[in-house]
Amino acid sequence: MLQGPNRGLLAVFGSTLFQLVGIFMLSPLLLLMLNQAGVSNTVAGLFAATTWLGIFIITPFASGLVRWIGRRRALWLASGLPLLTVLGFLSTRSLPAWFVLELLASVAGGLRWVLAESFIAEFAPPNQRGRLIGAYATLIGSTMVIGPALVAWLGVDSPHALWAVLAMLVAGFTWTFLIPRVPAADDADSASVGLRGLWHAVVAHPVVMLAGFVGGFFEMGLGSVLPLYGLSLGLGAGAAALLLSVSGFGGTVFAIPAGMLADRFADPARGRHRLMRWLVALLAGAAAAGFAVPALPLLVWPIALVWGAAGGTLYTLTMLDIGSRERGITLVNSTSVLVLTYTLGALLASSCAGVLLDWSPGMVFPAVLLSVAATGWWVLWRSPVK
């Protein structure tokens, strides 16, 4: 039987597989159900942004909660609460209630996100950390493919779709009980928590956090509204949902090679920084291609691929950078800030994208994306490697 770190890695990977398949089924399913109900793109975009708002709310308090109840209990709490919210989606079609349920689910999801990534970084051997974090990112990317694909297969009108989501979440929750007991962190009494701890992490890793913001903006923020983008271009509901799968496929393909490459850098910090610059430049190119989408709608497919590939790999590198530097509660703090900046990028993108798609999908929408990518590239280019 697997023991210690190996068992912990397997448990985190297994729970993540099932829970995120459920989550990535739920997100496009709810958006498409709102569209069928006649809800505007603006309101639907705000609903998508609620996901990131909940994550943004919980991350400042993650390290304090972990110190209070422990890492395993916190993970059980974060994995169990979404089960109740899906039961709520099954029982009501009230739009205000759906906003509340989505907020609760995203609070739990944010806590689980921080804990799972800190577990991976702590359980992974130092000489294999890049490939294991890359494998974890690949797993996440695969769930972004599988979840929307299952929605397209089951159909938005299927009475079994939400029940399938619930089954996936139950399976993921069960896997979390295999995580072994972990000793108290060495810095449990000395590390800062809450807002003070977050501020220390921001000061320690400002450029990494900016890269996390850009990754969140393109991979998850824009990814969450890809179905709306597809519908605005005249795609059917099934094809619009599959845009999410294309984005997820991009992150899946490149995460492990990026992690393996990062393990081989002679100067790891400098190598990661250089690769981040190239990835942000690629995102800028994809944003510029958005100006041609109204005339060439098929361009939306490679653009979605680049958003997922470059944005996801960018986040993988930031996660690896944090995991290579920190341990214990300090690692939870730094992971929380990384999740916070990634979430802030996703929240900004998803909340603005619906309005921009309603207003000017061919000009203002790509112009905003290009400005974000260009700003990120300029800061990364000018910043020294620490």
Where are these predicted regions, by residue range?
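Helix-loop boundary and gating motifs at the non-cytosolic
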Residues: L2-W52, H205-A211, E219-L233, A240
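A late C-terminal transmembrane helix in Major Facilitator Superfamily
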Residues: I329-D358
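Helix-to-loop junctions at the C-terminal end of transmembrane segments
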Residues: I58-G70, G155, F254-R270, L357
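C-terminal transmembrane helical hairpin of 12-TM major facilitator-type secondary transporters
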Residues: R270-Y315
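Cytoplasmic helix-loop-helix junction between adjacent transmembrane helices
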Residues: L103-T138
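Symmetry-related core transmembrane helices of the 12-TM Major Facilitator Superfamily/SLC fold
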Residues: L162-F177, F365-L380
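Structural signature of the two symmetry-related core transmembrane helices
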Residues: R73-L87, R272-A288, L370
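Intracellular juxtamembrane helix-capping segments at the cytosolic ends
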Residues: L111-A124, G312-E326
